[in-house]
Amino acid sequence: PYIKVESSLQAVKDIAEFYLQQLQIPVVGITGSVGKTSTKEVIASVLKEKYRTLKTQGNFNNELGLPLTVFRLRDEDEIAVLEMGISDFGEMTRLAKIARPNTCVITNIGTCHLENLGDRDGVLKAKTEIFKYLQKDGHIVLNGDDDKLCMVKEYEGIKPVCLLYTSDAADDS
């Protein structure tokens, strides 16, 4: 016996989306031009102090890697920290549809993948596709030091939290 599908990749993505929805656990979705993996590691490290946390292994962050990560989730897991990498328009929408994050983190808007995305404005547009599937009571965390991310003021009533990383922080005592 077998199940015939038009696209095995689409079937894997659809099953991962369904599986994650059944588990009903919070998801932190992380994207950005650089720093995704380091940010994922830091967030997962903090969360695992209190919650049973599953994180993306390595950088299994594409349209096959994300579903494979989701399939590692078990009933006892309490939160998922999922890295999402893209190189073209529409990819983030497809990844976010699977993950449906409660919290979106965007590390920065750089110059990676300009061959498909055109310029940094294109990168911003592609990365912020993650918001389309953000949970209604969700959170957006942005790098406040990134000039492009500072332009994101809100998404459907959700105002982003912008984190600043400056060397002046120690001088504010």
Question: Where do the language-model regions lie?
Answer:
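Short hydrophobic/aromatic-rich beta-strand motifs
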Residues: 1-2, 141
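Conserved small/polar residues in nucleotide/adenosyl-binding loops
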Residues: 165-172
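Phosphate-binding loop of NTP-binding sites
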Residues: 10-144, 148-156
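Proteins enriched for Cys/Gly/acidic motifs involved in redox and nucleic-acid/cofactor modification
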Residues: 41, 162-163
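N-terminal pre-Walker A segment at the start of P-loop NTPase domains
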Residues: 3-9
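Conserved beta-strand segments of alpha/beta enzyme cores
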Residues: 1, 52, 159-161
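Conserved beta-strand termini and adjacent loop/short-helix elements that scaffold enzyme active sites
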Residues: 5, 56, 143, 163-164
